[in-house]
Swiss-Prot record:
Residues 10-174 form the Small GTPase Ran-type domain. It comes from Arabidopsis thaliana (Mouse-ear cress). Coiled coil: none annotated. The keyword Nucleotide-binding applies. This is GTP-binding nuclear protein Ran-2. GTP binds at residues 21-28, 71, 125-128, 153-155. One of its GO terms (cellular component) is nucleolus. Belongs to the small GTPase superfamily. Ran family. Found in a nuclear export complex with RanGTP, exportin and pre-miRNA. Interacts with RanBP1a and RanBP1b. Interacts with PHRIP1. Interacts with KPNB1. Binds to PHIP1. The keyword tRNA processing does not apply. Residues 202-212 have a biased composition (Low complexity). GO terms for molecular function: GTP binding; GTPase activity; mRNA binding. The gene is RAN2. Residues 40-48 are annotated as: Switch-I.
Amino acid sequence: MALPNQQTVDYPSFKLVIVGDGGTGKTTFVKRHLTGEFEKKYEPTIGVEVHPLDFFTNCGKIRFYCWDTAGQEKFGGLRDGYYIHGQCAIIMFDVTARLTYKNVPTWHRDLCRVCENIPIVLCGNKVDVKNRQVKAKQVTFHRKKNLQYYEISAKSNYNFEKPFLYLARKLAGDQNLHFVESPALAPPEVHLDIAAQQQNEADLAAAAAQPLPDDDDDAFE
């Protein structure tokens, strides 16, 4: 399906909407993919930048047309035109800012009101920053809504490909799909050392084993 400002390509392509509070790192994340950044198009009627991100899988090439809001979410909600025809989504929050996580349910509701039954990934960004406010055990929304959750660090490229691989597998209906080469990414601006990565993964595993609280707000008392 060709959407405004999207050239048609002869391989599978999908509209990916990225939502979340302003300042959570959505634009930084999308811009890591260098060819997508080079080929982005501005869609003035809706006020978004559309980045075509190509990935190479064992089943051939796949493209995500990533819709980036260009910061307009800071002035209230996004128009329905941003969501219409969305085929998959990423909801992003900032692990150093609690309010951005508390607003995740609102973004999820707005998304699901327009796009029913699409695969959604929740991403906690900025795990490279030391003063983390939202701990792994406090992130429970994805478990209640059956979403996939990844912790990422856009500036260090940590886990950059994981949300895209999850969505590609869901959209292709093939859990064995995998990327056969990495896209060209911008050089890391910060480095997340191996010990920090291992600690993150251990914290996530421990959090997944905990029973769910009755209410998300309990975790922040």
